[in-house]
Amino acid sequence: MKGFKIPEATISRLSVYSRYLENLYRKGITTVSSADIAQGVGVTSAQVRKDLAYFGEFGTRGVGYNVKELLDHTLKILGLNNTWNMVVVGAGNLGSALCAYRGFRERGFYIVGVFDNDLTKIGKKINEYEVLPIDKLEEVVRENNVEIGIIAVPAAYAQDVATRLVKAGVKGILNFAPTVLNVPDKVIVRSVDLTVNLEVLTFNIRRD
Ligand SMILES: NC(=O)c1ccc[n+]([C@@H]2O[C@H](COP(=O)([O-])OP(=O)(O)OC[C@H]3O[C@@H](n4cnc5c(N)ncnc54)[C@H](O)[C@@H]3O)[C@@H](O)[C@H]2O)c1
C-alpha cells in the first residue's frame, strides 16, 4: 500500500463502503457482490472494484466478498481496528454539537476532553463532558495518548490552538475554522469548510 499514492476520493469511498458493510454485518448478511455495494452506496461496481484493488485481492469471482473479512480489511486500512482518543478545542456552538454526536463513538473515536478559554463556559457540562480550561490541554493529551485534535474556535485563534495541539503531541488535526493552518509536515490536517462545500454545490447547481 505504501509507495504509491492512493487518491483521497478512494479513501473517502472506503469509509462509506466500510459503514455499508458494517450495516450488512449487523443484519447477519455474510456475502456481498461489488454490484450490491455499488448500489448500496451509489457508485458503479467498477468503481468499487477499482477502489478495493488498491489494497490487494479481495473476494472470489462469482461468489463475491465475505462481508466480515472485507469489513475487517476496510477498518484496518482506515486505521479503525483500534480506537482513537480526541480532544475538542472550542466549546461553542460547533464544539457542543460535535460532543453531542454519537456517531464518533460508534466508529471508535472517543472525545476525552473539551476545552475552552471562556471562564463562563469552563466547568459547565456539554452532555457528559465537563468543559476544561485550555491550560489543561497538554496534560490531557499526554495522559490519554490523544492523537487527534479537533479545532472548533474562531478562525483568528485557530493557529494558536493548532500550535498548542502539535506541541502537546497530536498527530492529526480536524480543523473546522475557515483558515489555513501552519503545522509541521508530520502532522496531518483535514479541514472541513462547510462554506466551500456549499459553494461547490451552488457551482454545480448553476452549471447543470
Ligand atoms: N457553527 C457552525 O455551524 C460552524 C460551521 C462550520 C464551521 N464553523 C467554524 O467553527 C468554529 C467555531 O464556530 P462556533 O459557531 O462554534 O463558534 P462559537 O463562537 O460558538 O464557539 C467558539 C468557542 O471557541 C472558544 N475559544 C476562542 N478562542 C479560544 C482559545 N484560544 N482556546 C480555547 N477556546 C477558545 C470560545 O470561547 C467559544 O466558546 C469557527 O471557526 C467557525 O467558523 C462553525
Swiss-Prot record:
GO cellular component: cytoplasm
Main location class: cytoplasm
SMART domains cross-referenced by the UniProt entry: CoA_binding (SM00881)
DNA-binding region: 16-55
Keywords: Cytoplasm, DNA-binding, NAD, Repressor, Transcription, Transcription regulation
Keyword DNA-binding attributed: yes
Localization annotation: Cytoplasm
Gene3D superfamilies linked: NAD(P)-binding Rossmann-like Domain, Winged helix-like DNA-binding domain superfamily/Winged helix DNA-binding domain
Repressor recorded as keyword: yes
Chain coiled-coil ranges: none
Residue intervals passing through the bilayer: none
Binding site for NAD(+): G90, A91, G92, N93, L94, G95
GO function terms (MF aspect): DNA binding; DNA-binding transcription factor activity
Pfam families for the chain: CoA_binding (PF02629), Put_DNA-bind_N (PF06971)
GO BP annotations, alphabetical order: negative regulation of DNA-templated transcription; response to redox state
SUPFAM superfamilies: NAD(P)-binding Rossmann-fold domains (SSF51735), Winged helix' DNA-binding domain (SSF46785)
HAMAP family associated with the record: Rex
Function: Modulates transcription in response to changes in cellular NADH/NAD(+) redox state.
Description of how the protein assembles with itself and partners: Homodimer.
NCBIfam families referenced in this protein's UniProt entry, alphabetically: PRK05472.1-3 (NF003989), PRK05472.2-1 (NF003992), PRK05472.2-2 (NF003993), PRK05472.2-3 (NF003994), PRK05472.2-4 (NF003995), PRK05472.2-5 (NF003996)
Family recorded in the similarity comment: Belongs to the transcriptional regulatory Rex family.
The protein, known as: Redox-sensing transcriptional repressor Rex
Species assigned in the record: Carboxydothermus hydrogenoformans (strain ATCC BAA-161 / DSM 6008 / Z-2901)
